[in-house]
């Protein structure tokens, strides 16, 4: 009988202790957190937590930071599509400013390029004809570089006179027959460019020069005879 009473009291004490006890799971951070002082930073507190709990807290922090930004991510494609025309306009303005700066920096080269535009148009329309036209002169320049030096200086000093001279060069057949006579003829042309604004008159003079043997033998005496020039005028 005494044993039964003792067992009954034991069961009653166990039930009372179970009803009033607080269970702490293994993965809970409450025991450790209760021991930490309140003035520690959250970073130090997170380092002192249970290692099992740390990944869950990191995931919770990431989710907390991403969820408020989710409407922005949903609206971002439409905002980018609305900003594309503005981006293209800004890019075009930047290109235009760069071209203006390039033109202002190289104004002389830009003006010379506009003066050489007829030859560039010929090269763009018919590249074969342009190459055939330039081939005899390039061969002559390669064969006689020193004799073509005055023409390079003329191009640097007076581009308009140089262009007039270059426009008349393809009509001269003397370059294919006699390069030496052609070079002599070209050396005489700069002296007539300033007095003959008419290209047709200069072309007629070019056609008459090969028949004048005095120009090929003695250019000084030839300069003193304005017979051909006066007859043409």
From Swiss-Prot:
Disulfide-bond pairs as recorded: none
InterPro entries per the UniProt record, alphabetical: Zein, Zein-alpha
Domain of life, source organism: Eukaryota
Signal peptide: 1-21
Keyword tags: Repeat, Seed storage protein, Signal, Storage protein
GO molecular function, one term: nutrient reservoir activity
Keyword Flavoprotein: no
Function: Zeins are major seed storage proteins.
Misc. remarks from the entry: The alpha zeins of 19 kDa and 22 kDa account for 70% of the total zein fraction. They are encoded by a large multigene family.
Family: Belongs to the zein family.
UniProt name for this protein: Zein-alpha PMS2
Organism of this sequence: Zea mays
């Amino acid at each position: 009988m005494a044993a039964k009473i003792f067992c009954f009291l034991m069961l009653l004490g166990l039930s009372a202790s179970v009803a009033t006890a607080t269970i702490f799971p293994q993965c809970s951070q409450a025991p450790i957190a209760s021991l930490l002082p309140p003035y520690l930073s959250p970073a130090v507190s997170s380092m002192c937590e249970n290692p099992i709990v740390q990944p869950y807290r990191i995931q919770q922090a990431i989710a907390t930071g991403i969820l408020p930004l989710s409407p922005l991510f949903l609206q971002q494609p439409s905002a980018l599509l609305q900003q594309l025309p503005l981006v293209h306009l800004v890019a075009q303005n930047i290109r235009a400013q760069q071209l203006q700066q390039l033109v202002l920096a190289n104004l002389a080269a830009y003006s010379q390029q506009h003066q050489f535009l007829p030859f560039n148009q010929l090269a763009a329309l018919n590249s074969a004809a342009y190459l055939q036209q330039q081939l005899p002169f390039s061969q002559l320049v390669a064969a006689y570089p020193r004799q073509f030096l005055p023409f390079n200086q003329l191009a640097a000093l007076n581009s308009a006179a140089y262009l007039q001279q270059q426009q008349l060069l393809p009509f001269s057949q003397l370059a294919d027959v006699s390069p030496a006579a052609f070079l002599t003829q070209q050396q005489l042309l700069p002296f007539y460019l300033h007095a003959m604004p008419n290209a047709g008159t200069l072309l007629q003079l070019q056609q008459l020069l090969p028949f004048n043997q005095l120009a090929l033998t003695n250019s000084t005496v030839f300069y003193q005879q304005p017979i051909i020039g006066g007859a043409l005028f």
